[in-house]
Swiss-Prot record:
GO terms for cellular component: chloroplast thylakoid membrane. It comes from Lotus japonicus. This is Photosystem I assembly protein Ycf3. GO terms for biological process: photosynthesis. It is a peripheral membrane protein.
């Protein structure tokens, strides 16, 4: 049974109903419909913390989806799961792949910055200030890109950039 039929969450149910209606009225191929079904089921599983199931659905959606823009969101969500699992190298890889297909994903730049900042803090705890500065500089570059795409967002990042004199 498709995940959308067994999910008890009202918002997920509403999304599923609207998505099903759109799939019926918007002219799409059967492959596009199937890809979206896997994507939707992946989002549902991810929202419940069922990451293994979500990844299976996202990988199937990637196999079927041909549109680069749509693929960017699938890749982004895979990155989110790897971030949640503490697999930062894999997460960065998927965020990069998402941005290759859609360079207007400020949330991907933000998440990459957060990972780099975290790695900078780890380097400080290990006593390696040179490596830490390198990670912080990389975080700053990603945050600048996120802020450039959505100037009113990422206020904490903007403050950090100003405090650390990395904001131009």
């Amino acid at each position: 049974m498709p995940r959308s039929r067994i999910n008890g969450n009202f918002i997920d149910k509403t999304f599923s109903v609207v998505a099903n209606i759109l799939l019926q009225i918007i002219p799409t191929t059967s492959g596009e419909k199937e890809a979206f079904t896997y994507y939707r089921d992946g989002m549902s599983a991810q929202s419940e913390g069922n990451y293994a199931e979500a990844l299976q659905n996202y990988y199937e959606a990637m196999r079927l989806e041909v549109d680069p823009y749509d693929r960017s969101y699938i890749l982004y969500n895979i990155g989110l799961i790897h971030t949640s699992n503490g697999e930062h190298t894999k997460a960065l890889e998927y965020y990069f792949r998402a941005l290759e297909r859609n360079p207007f994903l400020p949330q991907a730049f933000n998440n990459m910055a957060v990972i780099c900042h975290y790695r900078g803090e780890q380097a400080i705890r290990q006593g390696d200030s040179e490596i830490a500065e390198s990670w912080f500089d990389q975080a700053a570059e990603y945050w600048k890109q996120a802020i450039a795409l959505t100037p009113g967002n990422y206020i904490e990042a903007q403050n950090w950039l100003k405090i650390t004199r990395r904001f131009e």
